[in-house]
Amino acid sequence: MTEPVFVKGEKALYGPKAEPALIDVPPMKFFMIEGVGNPNEEGGAYQQAVGLLYALSYTVKMSVKGGYTPNGYFDYSVAPLEGLWRMADGSAGVDYDRKSQFAWTSMIRQPDFVTDEVFQWAIAEVRRKKKLDAVAARLATYAEGLCVQCLHIGPYSA
């Protein structure tokens, strides 16, 4: 049986070219956490959220090694971290001089076999094994739709 295409086989979505391109991003499942604050703050809300997202994602990926096999499971690579950024006060654009006012949604894409049941199992495992509070995490489908994809090279503040 061939492994379903997941992230690595989707170059149009995860392999931007040097020239901007119009792409249509289909609805996809993600583990998501929302918050506000400077992403560079040591031990801050953003860094904690990223740690929790990876803990949940790797718990699902490694589930078969622990004796739990979700229905439809296939081996895959954990998807890259993605994020949505805006200002907490609703102002247009992003003001890099006010990083403490960044509102963010950090997310890691999940395979289609990740259901609410699998998500709840992963939350329980992360609480039990890693002692992490996963109350802020959620499983949701995000539909980006038609957008422009462009490759940015350089610092985030540029």
Predicted segments, located by residue:
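A solvent-exposed interaction/effector surface
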Residues: 1-158
